[in-house]
Amino acid sequence: MRAFLVLGMFTASLSNAAWRDYQEARDLALDARGVNTVEIVTGAGSLEVRGNPNARKISVTAPIQVPGKNEEKARKVIESRLVLTLERDGDSAALNGYFDSSRWGWGGSPSVRLEVEVPESVGLDIQDGAGSIKIRGVLGDIIVEDGSGSSMVPARSL
């Protein structure tokens, strides 16, 4: 009887470990001199943009979550489906942070949360798929196209 109880507890703990979410974070940065607008395209996950009067670069921290996958499988999902780029295009910077959804798979949807710091004077052009948006301290023009989720832009950011 004890053997069955121990075996049951061992099996339950293994199945619990197998279904934990995999998490990692990535960082991006780009010199912001001459950048007037930051164009941001996101998918599932929240977006937070903070304007900083002393910032000389655009800094991004991107916590990534892949639910229900062990590390090896999660890394395969990240390598094959994650789009995470920060590039300059003239006087604009383009930030893309999302998982390519054209490839369907089992399990929960992976997400990438974007935490972005920009010079306070830049404008923002945001296309958001799903998730909350918080913008504060940004003095430039702000355009938001939001698929779903809440948006918060304090009056001083307008």
Language model: regions and residue ranges:
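Sec-dependent signal peptide recognition
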Residues: M1-L7
